[in-house]
Amino acid sequence: MENNIKLLDGSMSYPLELDGYNLNNRLWTGDALINNPELIKKIHKGYINSGADYLLTSTYQISYDILREKGINLEKIKEVFQKSLDLAKKAIIESKTKKDIKIVASLGPFASYKKNASEYVGIYDSTDDEIYNFHCNNLN
């Protein structure tokens, strides 16, 4: 019987914390993507070596809106999102795995941007247009 079970990688935050990385900031694990990309690649490789079939990009807490608030221009924002893909690709190549590992974009909910814990209850104090525009900006 063929095994159709596929494994998604695990948390970015836990391995970062184990490595001593301070996640107490607005970008959470995205801070490591910007300031310590080699550590992100190392974590991806660890998940590949553990059997992951899918790697999530390290962009859950990163959004166009948060980066704009930090004064980052559109070109740099695109570079940050591209870097998350490139690191996952490099981890796959460097691991020399024979598996066909897929990369999945990790895009956090609108509520994670709001910083009010509403992602845990799903009650957003926002309009549909605000939520729509938030996600469109991230996808562009």
Model-based region annotation:
Residues M1-N140:
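Domain-level signal for soluble alpha/beta catalytic cores
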